[in-house]
Amino acid sequence: MKIINSMKKHYKLRRFLKYAKIGGGFSLCAQSNCFADKKGLITIGNNCEIFGTLYSMENGKITIGDYTEIRENSFIGSVDEIKIGSYVIISNNIKIYDNNNHPTDPKIRKEMCKNGFYGDAWRWNHSEHARVIIEDNVWIGERSTILKGVTIGEGSIVGCNSVVTKDVPPYSIVAGNPAKVVKLIEH
């Protein structure tokens, strides 16, 4: 089993190197993944651990600062721009999208179903999108979702199972669906 996991990690590293600019001290696991329509749209800082999936479609940029961790089964999908600062902890099973993932127009959705999953209508650029910014020293709790157009301020915490639909002020704790400020953090 160790040999198989080692082979998977080597294969995944090659995929990351194909699509991303990676800083020193990079770590991944057998479940790590990286996909992009174009090379060079994903940038990963120094001493990062990426145990989830990064997905850039069209011209979607993903930038990750230094000493940031993205844990298992997390998915970051961009068609616009997602900026993640340094010293950020993204827990397990997190979803971060800078887009609606599917168009809201019923005619386009009907076309999607008629033409199958790999048709052009399934591309994220057909859905509404807006950049996501996660500032430095943020902790995102397990099973949370961050939606398009959101900025999470420096030093903030997103509680487990939260759905973040609006900006989070710096040094605050948010929780719930939709996420609301439940406490301020002294700093």
Q: Which stretches of residues belong to each language-model region?
A:
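Domain-scale signature associated with acetyltransferase and cell-envelope carbohydrate enzymes
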Residues: 1-115, 119, 124-137, 144, ...
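Short Gly/Pro-enriched loop/turn and capping motifs at secondary-structure junctions
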Residues: 139, 145-147, 165
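Active-site/ligand-binding-proximal alpha/beta "capping" segment
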Residues: 149-151
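Alpha-helix N-cap/helix-start motif at helix boundaries, enriched for small hydrophobics
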Residues: 156-157, 173
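A generic "structured core" feature
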Residues: 157-163
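Gly/Pro- and small hydrophobic-enriched strand-loop and loop-to-helix capping segments
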Residues: 165-171
